[in-house]
Amino acid sequence: MSLQQKIKAYLKLGKLGVVSLLDLAAVAGAFLAYKHGISLLPIIPMFIGGTLASMGAMIINSGIEIDRDKVMSRTSKRPTVVGYVNRKEAIIVGSLLAILGTALGFIDNILTAFFIALGVVIYIFVYTILLKPRTWLNIVIGGFAGSAAAWAGYTSLTNSLTLEGFLLGFLIFMWTPGHFWSLALKYREDYVNAHYPMLPAVVGITTSARAIAISNTLMIPIVLLLGYYINLIALIAFSILSLFLMFLSYRLILNPTKEEAIKSFIFSNIYLMLILLIMIIVKLI
């Protein structure tokens, strides 16, 4: 296998699509903390470090889950499953990236490095190893891994975590269950076959649809409170986006199908992305 093919395999295992959303959360966190006269340069080591650490965590996850990935159609073609990267390689390379990413966080401050490392620890040890194979609460508690990215971004400029910074991380924590349960509902049989107790594999489609709607509903007050802290423009924009999210959640309850679930999954991605982009834009205006 050529070096170029190996690099492509690791990039695929690094899940750049997922990592890019974490990066956006980190940058949004930094801009949320930004005040006139503060240098934006600390964003650079935080961004690079967070990206490397997040990719490292994803690669380690793929190394750990090879056996279960083999029986899931969604993951059966991962480089770790088809043999391009073995378990030992994935864990070693992923660990090196996570360590390097955390080290870059120290260029800003200890708190930023701590949150970068915390995201890795929660994703690997709490979510992947401890909770995912054992309880449907896996993605609920594991959502704090995403929160850590936002907190790393916020602290990169402030070296402290205030209420507004905490709210951004808590928003991501609240967003995570409904988002991933929507995906798990579509691939419910995969999780059943792999013996993962993801909520849709445990309680069925109808109850899962209700849980997704409830999860999304509980998130919205956090979104609106964060919008209130930012400014009126953000509050109005967040309100409009939240209304559409609730509309899709209501449709999923009325028609709990895989097709509606994937629509909810796709829009929840767009929803969070737009919330984060709006936060950045209003700070630049």
Swiss-Prot record:
Entries under PANTHER family matching the protein: PROTOHEME IX FARNESYLTRANSFERASE, MITOCHONDRIAL
InterPro entries: Protohaem_IX_farnesylTrfase (IPR006369), UbiA_prenyltransferase (IPR000537), UbiA_sf (IPR044878)
Additional observations: Carbon 2 of the heme B porphyrin ring is defined according to the Fischer nomenclature.
Compartments in which it is found: Cell membrane
Source species, domain of life: Archaea
Catalysed reactions listed for this entry: heme b + (2E,6E)-farnesyl diphosphate + H2O = Fe(II)-heme o + diphosphate
Role played: Converts heme B (protoheme IX) to heme O by substitution of the vinyl group on carbon 2 of heme B porphyrin ring with a hydroxyethyl farnesyl side group.
Protein name: Protoheme IX farnesyltransferase
Native species: Saccharolobus islandicus (strain Y.G.57.14 / Yellowstone #1)
Signal peptide: none
Keywords: Cell membrane, Heme biosynthesis, Membrane, Transferase, Transmembrane, Transmembrane helix
Topological type in the membrane: Multi-pass membrane protein
Gene that specifies this protein: ctaB
Pathway the protein takes part in: Porphyrin-containing compound metabolism; heme O biosynthesis; heme O from protoheme: step 1/1
Annotated transmembrane regions: 13-33, 40-60, 89-109, 110-130, 137-157, 165-185, 194-214, 218-238, 265-285
Family to which the UniProt record says this protein belongs: Belongs to the UbiA prenyltransferase family. Protoheme IX farnesyltransferase subfamily.
EC assignment: 2.5.1.141
NCBIfam families, A to Z: cyoE_ctaB
GO MF, one example: protoheme IX farnesyltransferase activity
Any GO BP: heme O biosynthetic process
A single GO cellular-component term on record: plasma membrane
